[in-house]
A protein has these predicted regions:
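Phosphate-binding/switch region of NTP-binding enzymes
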Residues: 1, 39, 56
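Short alpha-helical segments that sit at the start of domains
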Residues: 1-11
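Charged, alpha-helix-enriched surfaces in structured cytosolic catalytic cores
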Residues: 5, 20, 35, 39
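Generic hydrophobic alpha-helical scaffold/packing signal
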Residues: 11, 26, 38-41
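Short acidic, hydrophobic short linear motifs in intrinsically disordered regions
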Residues: 16-29
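Short amphipathic alpha-helical interaction segments
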Residues: 31-46
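A short, conserved structural fragment
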Residues: 45-56
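Short, cationic-aromatic polyanion-contact patches
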Residues: 55-69
Length: 69
């Protein structure tokens, strides 16, 4: 079905080459609850609108980034 306002916002935020981490997405979607941002992001990955890539950060921690397909 049609994307929700939150889904459309997540996809547009993830439109850059680098993608976005969940923390940044939550910060940019402050009108929405964190759990809703997490749920909608997971749904978008399942639909294929986003892909999740795990990137090793400079501190050796791996971070998941979401990138619009």
């Amino acid at each position: 079905g049609p994307q929700t306002a939150l889904q459309a916002r997540i996809v547009s935020l993830c439109g850059g080459e680098a993608g976005m981490t969940m923390g940044v997405l939550v910060n940019r979607c402050r009108k929405f609850r964190r759990e809703d941002v997490e749920k909608e992001t997971a749904a978008l990955v399942a639909q294929g609108a986003l892909r999740a890539e795990t990137v090793k950060g400079g501190n050796g921690k791996s971070v998941e980034r979401f990138i619009a397909n």
